[in-house]
Amino acid sequence: MLIPRKVKHRKQHHPRQRGIASGGTSVSFGDYGIQAMGHAYITNRQIESARIAINRHIKRGGKVWINIFPDRPLTKKPAETRMGSGKGSPEWWVANVKPGRVLFELSYPDEKIAREALTRAIHKLPIKARIVTREEQF
């Protein structure tokens, strides 16, 4: 699981999700990538699930890059707790994703298998996304 080793503050505010990604919008490491088409908080479990889906489909001979990192804590209060008495404890770590951001990149010799692997990963994510190649831009 991806979580930060050390953070300055355990709890953070939750900003509004607006605007488009200013960086990380093109495929720079691999040949194919998954590009977000909307806003979302993607948890560390969802990132790991998508990574496993890609690796299981391509088996060997390819390389996967994860371009996002869950660095924001989301808090939650326990069930059946009255309102007040402070903010809840951190439950998940999420990555704040904006439209245009490339989430995963893949380098694999066979295009058909690479696209199928990325499609399986997209189904694991709570966001609309598309497959882009190195030549395409947002």
Swiss-Prot record:
Q: Which InterPro entries match?
A: Ribosomal_uL16, Ribosomal_uL16_bact-type, Ribosomal_uL16_CS, Ribosomal_uL16_dom, Ribosomal_uL16_sf
Q: Mention one GO molecular function.
A: tRNA binding
Top-level division of the source organism's lineage: Bacteria
Q: Which SUPFAM superfamilies match?
A: Ribosomal protein L16p/L10e
Q: Where is this region: Disordered?
A: 1-24
- Keyword set, alphabetical order: Ribonucleoprotein, Ribosomal protein, RNA-binding, rRNA-binding, tRNA-binding
What residue spans carry the Basic residues bias annotation? 1-17
Pfam families recorded: Ribosomal_L16
Any Gene Ontology CC annotation: cytosolic large ribosomal subunit
Biological process GO annotation list?
A: translation
Q: How does it assemble?
A: Part of the 50S ribosomal subunit.
Family membership:
Belongs to the universal ribosomal protein uL16 family.
What does the function comment of this entry state?
Answer: Binds 23S rRNA and is also seen to make contacts with the A and possibly P site tRNAs.
What is the name of the protein in this document? Large ribosomal subunit protein uL16
What is this organism's lineage? Bacteria, Bacillati, Actinomycetota, Actinomycetes, Mycobacteriales
